[in-house]
Swiss-Prot record:
Protein name, per record: Type IV inositol polyphosphate 5-phosphatase 3
Reactions the enzyme catalyzes: a 1,2-diacyl-sn-glycero-3-phospho-(1D-myo-inositol-4,5-bisphosphate) + H2O = a 1,2-diacyl-sn-glycero-3-phospho-(1D-myo-inositol 4-phosphate) + phosphate; a 1,2-diacyl-sn-glycero-3-phospho-(1D-myo-inositol-3,4,5-trisphosphate) + H2O = a 1,2-diacyl-sn-glycero-3-phospho-(1D-myo-inositol-3,4-bisphosphate) + phosphate
Location of the region described as Catalytic 1 in the Swiss-Prot/TrEMBL record: 514-529
Top-level taxon of origin: Eukaryota
Native species: Arabidopsis thaliana
Function, as annotated: Has phosphatase activity toward PtdIns(4,5)P2 and PtdIns(3,4,5)P3.
Gene3D superfamilies (alphabetical): Endonuclease/exonuclease/phosphatase
Record-linked PANTHER family: TYPE IV INOSITOL POLYPHOSPHATE 5-PHOSPHATASE 3, TYPE IV INOSITOL POLYPHOSPHATE 5-PHOSPHATASE 9
Annotated SMART domains: IPPc
Biased composition regions of type Acidic residues, renumbered to the chain: 40-66
């Protein structure tokens, strides 16, 4: 046998295997067979998470896996105290239910009394901002310069962005019955990522209004950790792809030669560049601007009375040069009580390897020649504290190659034919989101193909369960189409199941969740005539036009979305527009008749959600206009401090009861 024959056999075998795999994928798609744990895309950020763990000594780093085309993994259950408490609560509830079930027949010693520690005693309520957007893009791939800033409201940053797209691929026979085309997903995700990189989050910091700080004005560190981490992430890790470059020295000749160190809005000391009268060379001098009691010395991270030295040859040519630097949120953590005393900070800094992350937030306003001068002066070690020496040893030039991480990460991204649901969250919030699960339901061709249907995501944010459903329902203006849309909704509720490997009582169905948001192209139309609809639109009489809306009629009669809520429609119908135009399609007989309608909707179910506003965006990219809803949603946050206090009180009560029993 010639050497060519085995290669030909292997190539033929590989081709046959690919054909079998393609046929398997198509059959699974036709029959709407999905795995028990469906695949989805998510950002991989293990390296940065490890950096956060080393920098912040945080043991509860995120465990994200997967990527585009990879399988997202369900989060671990016992990653932090919150999950441990959730698991313990579930076990306690199960035990209580079992005790109640056998209470009639069980002996007295087997009966368990109810817990005296109420849930409200160790849970705090917190609001997060959720931006929900839906858009039918009509099968058009986005251009690289597509502007979606208004749609996602980057001027009002949210904690979570839930974005649902419909018809990301043309709904032709090849895309409906053939293998799934995921190329548009990467394009849309890139557009979304670039837009979110331009978001400037509003920072909420911890301020000290007294000097020295008053213990009563500070929250425990575990409660302020998220605020600090958010500030650090914004100052050090936002604006992905932005590199730090030296600034021209000549532009700063007119500025003062000083370096101000800030702490809670107050200047602690200043660094001046002076000229040595003996040598005529520039030197650096650090002076105290005001006196501080010795008992507060531990609050000064970078402290020195004075030091002098000779700069290098480069600095002699440019004269007096300095680096203006200001401490960012990362460095201020070490300045604020109740952090460890600073007499312990020096050895820790010297023992560690030079950290890029610690230095990169020092804002350089001069060239690296001035940095060389500072390093040369510090190298003489004339009574300079070890903290300053450690900073001098760090190579600021590495900042040139350091790129900042984005403030938002992709939590989950799932496609079914033309339906795409993608969720993005703040980096600081990611570790508080667990139990991410995905479910897909097709109700299209033959009642199972995914050209119509829903992509749903279940997750827990802190101690609260959320569910987001992106849907594309049956189209058409006939009465039978309206009935089919109602049937689609019932099928989605019936067949949406979130599987889990754990048995801790995680929600399986849509209505098992506490906060539910349903978005998408629901395709409910207006029952009014084309002429009457256009007349009411021209008069902007939205309340009268809303009386003909099929969806409003359906949930008022309880046939679909009974008990759900929606914001007031104070904007024109979102469908159907001419291409790249502000005009609705004309009823001229050349094209199928399309009466304008509010097809694109966002609904909510459950308590603890407050709608801020509900609007559409004037984006002419497709024949639909995108819709945005902003919610403030309550989440329950576990408080270890409150739980400890509650358990302490309970123990005291038990001891008192035992003492009374002994006395009796």
């Amino acid at each position: 046998m010639s050497p060519v024959e085995p290669a030909g056999i292997m190539k033929k075998s590989h081709r046959q295997k690919s054909q079998r795999l393609w046929a398997k994928l198509v059959m699974r798609k036709w029959l709407n067979i999905s795995g028990r744990d469906p695949e989805y895309g998510a950002d991989t950020d293990n390296e940065s998470e490890n950096e956060d763990a080393r920098e912040d000594n945080d043991d509860s780093s995120s465990d994200e896996e997967g990527g585009s085309g990879s399988r997202g993994r369900e989060s671990k259950v016992y990653e932090n105290a919150e999950d441990a408490i959730a698991a313990a609560s579930a076990v306690v509830d199960a035990a209580a239910a079992a005790a109640e079930f056998i209470s009639n027949d069980a002996p007295m010693k087997l009966r368990r009394r109810n817990s005296e520690t109420l849930r409200a005693q160790y849970i705090n309520n917190k609001e997060i901002r959720v931006c929900v957007g839906t858009w039918n893009v009509g099968g058009i791939s986005p251009p690289s310069d597509l502007d979606i800033d208004d749609w996602i409201e980057i001027n009002q940053p949210a904690d979570i962005y839930v974005l649902g797209l419909q018809e990301i691929v043309p709904l032709n026979a090849g895309n409906i019955l053939g293998a799934e085309d995921d190329r548009p997903v990467a394009k849309w995700e890139e557009v979304i990522r670039e837009a979110l990189n331009r978001v400037r989050p509003k920072l909420s910091g911890v301020k000290s209004y007294s000097d020295p700080p008053s213990p009563g004005r500070f929250k425990p560190f575990e409660e302020t950790h998220d605020i600090i981490e958010e500030e650090v992430a914004f100052e050090s890790d936002s604006d992905a792809g932005v590199e730090i470059h030296p600034i021209d020295e000549e532009e700063e000749e007119e500025t003062d030669r000083l370096w101000a160190l800030k702490h809670d809005g107050g200047v602690i000391g200043e660094v001046k560049t002076l000229v040595d009268p003996n040598t005529g060379l520039p030197v650096v001098e650090i002076k105290r601007q005001f006196s501080i009691p010795k008992k507060l010395d531990r609050q000064l991270c970078l402290r020195a009375d004075s030091f002098k030295g000779i700069s290098d040859d480069d600095s002699t040519q440019t004269g007096m040069k300095t680096i203006n630097r200001m401490l960012s949120g990362k460095e201020r953590i070490g300045l604020s009580w109740p952090e460890p005393p600073l007499n312990m900070l020096g050895p820790c800094v010297l023992d560690r390897q030079p950290s890029i992350k610690t230095v990169k937030s020092l804002k350089t306003a001069k060239s690296f020649k001035a940095y060389s001068s500072f390093k040369s002066v510090a190298g003489n070690n004339n009574g300079i504290p070890p903290e300053v020496l450690a900073l001098a040893e760090m190579d600021l030039k590495l900042l040139m190659e350091r790129k900042r991480r984005p403030a938002y990460v992709r939590l989950v991204s799932k496609q079914m034919v033309g339906i795409l649901l993608t969720i993005w969250v703040k980096r600081s919030l990611r570790k508080h989101i667990q139990n991410v699960r995905v479910s897909t339901v097709g109700v299209g061709v033959m009642g199972y193909i995914g050209n119509k249907g829903a992509v749903s995501v279940s997750m827990s944010i802190n101690q609260t369960f959320f569910c987001f459903i992106n849907t594309h329902l049956t189209a058409g203006e006939r009465e039978v189409d309206q009935i089919k849309r109602n049937a689609d909704v019932h099928e989605i509720h019936k067949r949406t199941v979130f599987h889990s490997v754990s048995a801790l009582g995680l929600p399986k169905l849509i209505y098992d969740h506490e906060r539910i948001i349903w978005l998408g192209d629901l395709n409910y139309r207006l029952s009014s005539s084309y002429e009457k609809t256009r007349d009411l639109i021209s008069k902007r009489e939205w309340s009268k036009l809303l009386e003909y809306d099929q969806l409003v009629k359906e949930y008022r009669k309880g046939r679909a979305f009974d008990g759900w809520s929606e914001g007031t429609l104070h904007f024109p119908p979102t469908y159907k527009y001419q291409a790249n135009s502000d005009e609705y399609t004309a009823n001229d007989g050349k094209a199928p008749k399309r009466t304008p309608a509010w097809c694109d909707r966002v609904l909510s179910y459950g308590k603890g959600m407050r709608l801020v506003h509900y609007r559409r965006t004037e984006q002419k990219f497709s024949d639909h206009r995108p819709v945005t809803a902003i919610y403030m949603a309550e989440v329950e946050v576990f408080s270890a401090r409150k739980l400890q206090r509650a358990l302490t009180f309970t123990d005291a009560e038990i001891e008192d009861e035992g003492l009374v029993a002994v006395l009796v």
